[in-house]
A protein has these predicted regions:
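Short, solvent-exposed S/T- and G/P-enriched segments that are highly enriched in secreted/extracellular
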Residues: 186-191, 195-203, 231-233, 270-296
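Long, low-hydrophobicity ectodomains and other hydrophilic envelope-associated domains
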Residues: 63, 74-239, 382
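A short, amphipathic beta-strand motif
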Residues: 243-252, 261-263, 303, 332
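A short, solvent-exposed beta-strand micro-motif common in secreted/extracellular proteins
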Residues: 261, 300-310, 376
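Extracellular beta-sheet/turn segments enriched in Thr/Pro/Gly and aliphatic residues
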Residues: 230-239, 320-343
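Short, ordered, surface-exposed loop/turn motifs in non-cytosolic proteins
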Residues: 253-278
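Structured interaction patches on ligand/partner-binding surfaces of diverse proteins
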Residues: 287-290, 295-298, 311-329
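Catalytic cores of extracellular degradative/oxidative enzymes
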Residues: 312, 316, 341-387
Length: 387
């Protein structure tokens, strides 16, 4: 055999060997992947529950993705069905969490676009690969989601339910711009199911507009955090400016006044979020007060406004669709059912504790008169004395 022929045969066998090695690696990877897949029936069942919950929240996945999911389910082929479902749902995941066989939690940022709305809730998914097969509760914490309760100046109003609270500084308030909710209402749960792969729903709220960063810490029971903060994810969000609404509030005589408003979306979220309110809006009550001509920023969506002005006025409701464009004017006409002042009866509270009793020690702490006067006007209280 000629030398040139020997060289050609040698190259041919090298190519064949290389192709066989690649094929073997692919088959091994496919086998490992198949071993790590959840059982098909419960995975499809959980996927359907996830879609039902997203529909209920008013945040369904895209129509074409829902159609692709149904096509994947109809395949009834474990490897292809599960892989196709994951490929579709992973686009909506802000977090990918892995629990290794030793139950250590590791987290990274997912493929979803980190975008929020000022004063609005945004829904994302969390993908969890549970290699340990544990059934503990999944927990998510963030220092940016800590309380800003009762911050006036540079301290917190004491509600005396859990002892003397730590001070919350103005810097803390700036950093605590976010609220967070792991959605666990039926059919979703907070506990892991022990399936190898499952998805959770998380909702995030931004108090602010602009660029904001947050850290998220994941755990699944005690001592499950991975070493080196690998269970923590830092994400930079783009928080879009919401639509500013102009309130026009008139009393029974058609004169401008102040009223109480409880604002809800169809999921029951209260706006602005009570956890992120700053004076003059207070965290310990659902309502906020707005006088004629004032504004509030809300993201696009449908809201129910419940408004009144204390016990002398009827409680009325109005459904409002907020969309982009020019700031809409919202008109609220109050309706009084009784006027005790015509019988020489006047309402009042001459003993208003603005910060429990701490203001006896530090008069600067608590609610300022300028903030409290809005509440008095909004409840049609004739006399109010702040201690």
């Amino acid at each position: 055999m000629r030398k040139s022929h020997i060289i050609l045969v040698s190259k041919f066998y090298k190519k064949i060997t290389f192709c066989l090695v690649i094929l073997l690696l692919i088959l091994q990877r496919a086998e490992i992947r198949a071993q790590s897949l959840p059982a098909l029936q419960p995975f499809i069942f959980q996927t359907k529950q996830l879609l039902e919950s997203l529909d209920f929240l008013g945040t369904p996945i895209a129509v074409n993705d829902k159609s692709k999911l149904q096509d994947a389910i109809n395949k009834n082929d474990t490897l292809n069905t599960i892989t196709d479902i994951e490929d579709i749902l992973d686009k909506y995941c802000l977090f990918n969490v892995e629990i290794n066989p030793e139950s250590r939690v590791y987290a990274v940022q997912g493929a979803a676009k980190p975008e929020l709305w000022q004063n609005g809730w945004q829904t994302f998914l969390i993908k969890i690969e549970n290699q340990a097969g544990i059934t503990a509760k999944i927990q998510v914490l963030s220092p940016q989601a800590k309380e800003t309760f009762g911050v006036f100046g540079d301290v917190r109003v004491n509600n005396f339910t859990q002892g003397v609270p730590a001070k919350v500084t103005a810097k803390d308030v700036t950093d605590r711009w976010m609220d967070m909710n792991l959605y666990t209402k039926q059919p979703m749960k907070q506990e892991l199911s022990s399936m190898e792969v499952e998805y959770f729903i998380i909702q995030l709220y931004s108090r602010d507009a602009g660029k904001r960063k947050a850290r998220f810490n994941f755990s699944a029971g005690e001592a499950t955090e991975d070493l080196g903060f690998r269970n923590a994810v830092d994400i930079l969000f783009n928080c879009r400016q919401s639509t500013k609404l102009i309130f026009h509030v008139l009393d029974e005589n058609g004169k401008p006044t102040t009223a109480s408003f409880i604002i809800r979306d169809k999921q029951g979220h209260i706006y602005p979020s009570q956890a992120k309110r700053l004076a003059p809006d207070f965290y310990f009550q659902q309502q906020v007060y707005r006088k004629d001509g004032e504004q509030m920023a809300l993201p696009e969506g449908k809201y129910t406004f419940e408004y009144t002005r204390g016990p002398e006025y009827l409680v009325k409701t109005k459904t409002i669709n907020v969309s982009g464009g020019a700031p809409p004017s919202l008109n609220f006409a109050l309706e009084r059912w009784i006027d005790p002042s015509k019988l020489d009866w006047y309402s009042g509270d001459h003993h208003i504790h603005a910060a429990g009793c701490r203001h006896y020690e530090t008069p600067s702490e608590g609610v300022d008169p300028a903030d409290m006067i809005r509440h008095l006007f909004g409840e049609a209280v004739n006399v109010g004395c702040i201690l």
